[in-house]
Amino acid sequence: MVLVEYLWMVIVGFIIAFILAFSVGANDVANSFGTAVGSGVVTLRQACILASIFETTGSVLLGAKVGETIRKGIIDVNLYNNTVDLLMAGEVSAMVGSAVWQLIASFLRLPISGTHCIVGATIGFSLVAIGTHGVQWMQLVKIVASWFISPLLSGLMSGALFLMIKFFILKKEDPVPNGLKALPVFYAATIGINVFSILYTGAPLLGLESFPVWATALLSIGIAIIFALIVWFFVCPWMKKKIASRLKKEGALSRISEESLDKIQDEETSVFKELPGAKGNDESALPLTSSSTDAAVASDSVSNGNTRVPYGRAASMTNGSIRSPISNGTFNFDGHTVKSDVHVYHTVHKDSGLYKDLLHNIHLDRVKTDRPAPENNYRVLRRNNSYTCYTAAICGVPVHSTFKSSDVAMPEDSEKLVGDTVSYSKKRVRYDSYSSYCNAVAEAEIEAEEGGVEMKLATDLADPNPPQDDSLEEDKEEKDKSEVHLLFHFLQILTACFGSFAHGGNDVSNAIGPLVALWLIYEQGGVMQEASTPVWLLLYGGVGICAGLWVWGRRVIQTMGKDLTPITPSSGFTIELASAFTVVVASNIGLPISTTHCKVGSVVAVGWIRSRKAVDWRLFRNIFLAWFVTVPVAGLFSAGVMAILQYGILPYV
C-alpha cells in the first residue's frame, strides 16, 4: 500500500538526502585520501577522481548490508506501527540534523564521524516523537567508548608499525635492500586486510552476505600470498631498476649543478663601489673590475673578518669609477643621520652562482665572527627580485637600525629574527635580496638631512654561538629519501583506494540509510521495511558523496593530510594500513570503532613518533571536541526539525 498522501515528504527527503550525501563527501572522504594528498603521492584532482570511482563502486556493492543497521539498529521501529507518519517525519529530521552538523564541521575543517552524526540525529528525533523508551541506549554507550578506543587502539597499532619500518628501513644508510625485501610483505598485508574487510562486510550483489568467517579469512590469505609472489618476482626487480635509474639521474644532476656553479663564478662580473668614509674625501673612487680573481678576493673578505668598508650613495660614475659626494662617512636616512660603517658587497650577477656563493660566505662569517648583538629595531625593505627567499634563508638580510628613540613605529608586516634578546614575531614578512638592499641603502641617503641612526646588517648582528636546535634534525626527517618515496608511493595509493572502496560501502548508509527507510515505508505502507535496499538509491548516495568531495572535500583533506602533521609516503602507508587493520580486528571482536577516529589517531601517533614538535595539538584538541559534541549537536538539530514537523506541519496535512 503506497502512502500517496505523504509523497511530499518523500520528495523533501530525496532533496535533503542528496545534501546529506554531499556533506558526507565533503567531510568523511578525507579519511581515505587525506594522507595520500598530504604526502604528495597524488594530487587533489587525482584523489578526487580515484575517490569518485571507488566510493561509488563501494557504495553500490557493499552499502546495502550496512544500511540495515542505520535503519533498524538505533531505534525500535515497531513502536511506530500506528504512527507511520511520525517515523517518516523522523527520518527527514535525522537527515537534516546530520547534514547541517557535517556541513558546519566541513566549513571548520574538522573531520567528524558520519556514523555518529546520523546516530545522534536519529536519537534526537526519537526523543521528541515517543520519548526515551524508543532508543537503543547501548548504541550510545558504544559510541562514547569509541571516542577513546578508536584513536588509542589505532594510534598504538600505527606507532608500532611505523617504528618497525623506521628501524629496519628508514634509518638505514641504504634503505633499498631492506625495503625491497619488505615490499612483498607490505603488499600482501595491504591486499589481505582489505580483501578480508570487503568480504567480511558482505556484498549482497555479489552473493557474499552468507560467507562464513573462516572461508573469508582463508580466501584473503590465499589472495595475499599470490600477490606477494607477484611482487617478489616482478615488482621488486622493476622497482630496483627504477630506483637505480632515479639515483643515477640525481647524481648526474648534482654533478652538472656543481660544474655550472664553477663556470658561472669564472664568468661573473664583480662591481666594487666607492663607499663614503673610506678615504675621507669627496673624490674618493674605486675603479670597476671584471676579473674573477677580484671577485674571489671580495668574497673571501666577507668570510674571513677583514676590514669592513662602508657603503653609500653613488652620485656619479666616470671613466669606470663610481664617485661618492659624501666625505664624512655619514648620510641621512628617514630623518636621521646615518653612520655608514656597514660592510656590504654589491655584485652585478649574470646568474645566481656567485651570488649564492657570496651568501654562503656571509653565513659562515655570521657563525664564526665574535660580536655582541646590540639592541635592535628593524626595517624591512621592499621586495623586487627573485633572490628574496634564498637570501632570507641563508643570512636573514633585513636592515637593522639601532633607533634609540622608542617612538619609531614598526612596520605591520615586520618580523624580528636576530639576537638572543630579540623577541620573535610570527607575522608574515617579505625580505629583499642582498644586492637590492645595497641599492636601497644608497637611495635612502638623499631622503633626509639630520638624525642619529646607525645601520647594521643581520649578518653582523647574529649571535656568534647560536644555540643548537633539535628541530633541525627533526626537519631532516620530514621528507622521505627519493628511493623510500618510490618504495611506498604506489603502496599508499593502493591502500587509499581500498580504503575509499570500503568507506563508500560503509558511509553511504549514513547518507541514504534514512532515505531508504523513508522510501520503503512509503512504498510498502508499513514500518518493517522488509525489502532489500534498492541499488539505484545506493548509486544516488554515491553520486552525492562524489559531488561533495569535488566541491568542498579539499578543506578536510587539508586538515587530515597537512595541517595535523606532515605526511610522507612511508608514514601515510603506515597510517592507512594500521587504521584499516584496526577497524577490521575491532569490528570482528565487537569493539565499538570509528573509521574517522582511527585515522586521526594514527595520523597523530605517527606524526608524534616522526617529530615531537610536528603535531598540531591545538588542532587535535579541536577535533576531539568536535567528536564530543557531534552526537548531542546533531541530535539537537534533528529534534528541532522533528518538533516543527510533528507539531507545526503534520496536524495540518
Swiss-Prot record:
The chain crosses the membrane at residues 2-22, 47-67, 87-107, 110-130, 143-163, 188-208, 218-238, 484-504, 533-553, 573-587, 595-610, 623-643. GO terms for molecular function: sodium:phosphate symporter activity. Residues 1, 68-86, 131-142, 209-217, 505-532, 588-594, 644-653 are extracellular. The keyword Iron does not apply. It catalyses: 2 Na(+)(out) + phosphate(out) = 2 Na(+)(in) + phosphate(in). InterPro entries: Phos_transporter. GO terms for biological process: phosphate ion transport. Sodium-phosphate symporter which preferentially transports the monovalent form of phosphate with a stoichiometry of two sodium ions per phosphate ion. Belongs to the inorganic phosphate transporter (PiT) (TC 2.A.20) family. This is Sodium-dependent phosphate transporter 2. It comes from Xenopus tropicalis. The gene is slc20a2.
